[in-house]
Amino acid sequence: MHPSTPISSLFSFTSPAVKRLLGWKQGDEEEKWAEKAVDSLVKKLKKKKGAMDELERALSCPGQPSKCVTIPRSLDGRLQVSHRKGLPHVIYCRVWRWPDLQSHHELKPLECCEFPFGSKQKEVCINPYHYRRVETPVLPPVLVPRHSEYNPQLSLLAKFRSASLHSEPLMPHNATYPDSFQQSLCPAPPSSPGHVFPQSPCPTSYPHSPGSPSESDSPYQHSDFRPVCYEEPQHWCSVAYYELNNRVGETFQASSRSVLIDGFTDPSNNRNRFCLGLLSNVNRNSTIENTRRHIGKGVHLYYVGGEVYAECVSDSSIFVQSRNCNYQHGFHPATVCKIPSGCSLKVFNNQLFAQLLAQSVHHGFEVVYELTKMCTIRMSFVKGWGAEYHRQDVTSTPCWIEIHLHGPLQWLDKVLTQMGSPHNPISSVS
């Protein structure tokens, strides 16, 4: 090439195959990135007989059955496109179906897919029509009885209550993902890629609506109920940052379903990022300073399909205390779970919370109020706390955050308001 030829001309040629595939691209953002992603894919598929034809058939006839279109799985499962790494099925689902796709937690494979990402085979299917987007389940309303006639048999709440009513241990128990999660009560559903989490416990029957047929053995009989519905708030959570027992900075209100909390600085006030590097504290000691330097990329929170996931994208582990997560896995409510770098954990399940709340209303105001503890998640960066660490409380860790889940908290508030005053008023000494 002549020395005077602009470097940009090296990238100006787009092959006919890439142009054809880009014709099905969704959205108009990041044209160059999409072009490079498709070009990278075409080079891989041309080595496989019929793969290009199958992909074009799937894209041109989205309602028709299609075969898997696979590429080799990389060592870490990710694909690099123009200095950005991502999971291959997420990249191509974003290009051809959902431009606003944020995470693999939002995708589940169809039953017809033989090489879904979660199967950990040598090949991974990138056919965007072999995946579906996770839908947020509709939560049934909580039916608050005017007069309780509840027979507490087979209650999901029993285990939660018995554990919660005892005093907290001096030092919380510890668990590490994935080792401590292997012996869970239920196997992971095959549609949950890369996770060994059980599904939430199966619900017992919900209370019957007034006027609906009632089973003779139903625990809810002849009662008059007021339905209290779940409503999705504008900000699904708020995040407060602490150093030891000192609150630092303003509370971050999360409106985006994908939120990054990192140790860097971002003066642009990106609504998807909470940058802890921006926050100052005159009482900061050397331990805190050193810990802050290791937060790095921090934690990625996803709110998908009524579930909250925490993904550790820092080079150092994060430590999470979530009562909802602990309940799902049969741990003590105060257990602190270690999430190593590169791993993610489901830290809240709205459907499980709905089941517990629906049952708790029949046990009284105080038991419902106890569920407020389930709506707060504490998370420490770099340094752990609990029985296996010299720090026994989260307020002894250098850098930590407290996450309040607004939807469940507001639902609780409406249920408590409907229930009226407690028989034994809650106080600081109760």
Swiss-Prot record:
Gene Ontology cellular-component annotations: cytoplasm; nucleus; transcription regulator complex
Domain MH2: 236-430
Annotated spans, Disordered: 186-222
Keywords attached to this entry: Cytoplasm, DNA-binding, Metal-binding, Nucleus, Phosphoprotein, Transcription, Transcription regulation, Zinc
UniProt modification remark: Phosphorylated on serine by BMP (bone morphogenetic proteins) type 1 receptor kinase and activin type I receptor-like kinases (ALK-2, ALK-3 and ALK-6).
Pfam families reported for this sequence: MH1, MH2
GO annotation, biological process: BMP signaling pathway; bone development; cartilage development; hindbrain development; midbrain development; regulation of DNA-templated transcription; SMAD protein signal transduction; stem cell differentiation
Bias type Polar residues, positions: 202-221
Location in or out of the cell: Cytoplasm; Nucleus
Positions that bind Zn(2+): 68, 113, 125, 130
Recorded GO MF terms: DNA binding; metal ion binding
Family under the similarity heading: Belongs to the dwarfin/SMAD family.
Function: Transcriptional modulator activated by BMP (bone morphogenetic proteins) type 1 receptor kinase. SMAD9 is a receptor-regulated SMAD (R-SMAD). Has been shown to be activated by activin type I receptor-like kinases (ALK-2, ALK-3, ALK-6) which stimulate heteromerization between SMAD9 and SMAD4. May play a role in osteoblast differentiation and maturation.
Full protein name: Mothers against decapentaplegic homolog 9
Species this protein is from: Mus musculus (Mouse)
Gene name as annotated: Smad9
